[in-house]
A protein has these predicted regions:
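N-terminal leader segment of winged-helix/HTH proteins
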Residues: 1-34
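Histidine-centered active-site/metal-ligand motif
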Residues: 6, 69-70, 97, 108
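N-terminal helix-turn-helix DNA-binding core of bacterial DNA-binding proteins
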Residues: 21-65, 89-96
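Alpha-helical residues within the helix-turn-helix
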Residues: 58, 69, 75-76
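Beta-hairpin "wing" of winged helix-turn-helix
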Residues: 75-85, 92
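Conserved segment of winged-helix/HTH DNA-binding domains
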Residues: 90-117
Length: 117
């Protein structure tokens, strides 16, 4: 329990279940990662289609090296997956609860409708 200097009538048992500061670090990393609008845009596109770097760079109006840099960060965070087909590498949003939650949050916050809905 955390002794509070002022008693405002809150249920103290709730504080007993409060996560430790380090428990929020992983969550904070996702928010930091998505603090870049280019990464949010790339992630959103990949939630709806599978693409190569060349096509993605045209779609998001960025250079291929810049898109590759952002993809590497998204992939390292587990938000994007890739597969190789011959010489081409295709990227898509990861099929994970976190990726789906972030996709839904982006669309809800921006009132964006998914293609095909």
């Amino acid at each position: 329990m955390y002794p509070l200097p002022h008693d405002h009538g809150q249920a103290m048992e709730q504080l007993a279940h409060m996560p430790k500061p380090e428990d929020f670090q992983a969550i904070s990393r996702y928010f930091t990662l998505l603090g870049d609008s280019s990464r949010v845009r790339i992630f959103w596109v990949l939630c709806h289609c599978q693409e190569c770097v060349t096509n993605l760079s045209v779609m998001v109006e960025m250079s291929a090296p810049a898109v590759s840099h952002h993809l590497r960060q998204l992939k390292n965070a587990g938000l994007v997956e890739s597969r190789r087909e011959g010489k081409e590498v295709y990227y898509t949003a990861a099929h994970t609860p976190v990726a789906q939650l972030l996709h839904d949050a982006i669309e809800e916050m921006e009132q964006i409708t998914c293609p095909g809905r």
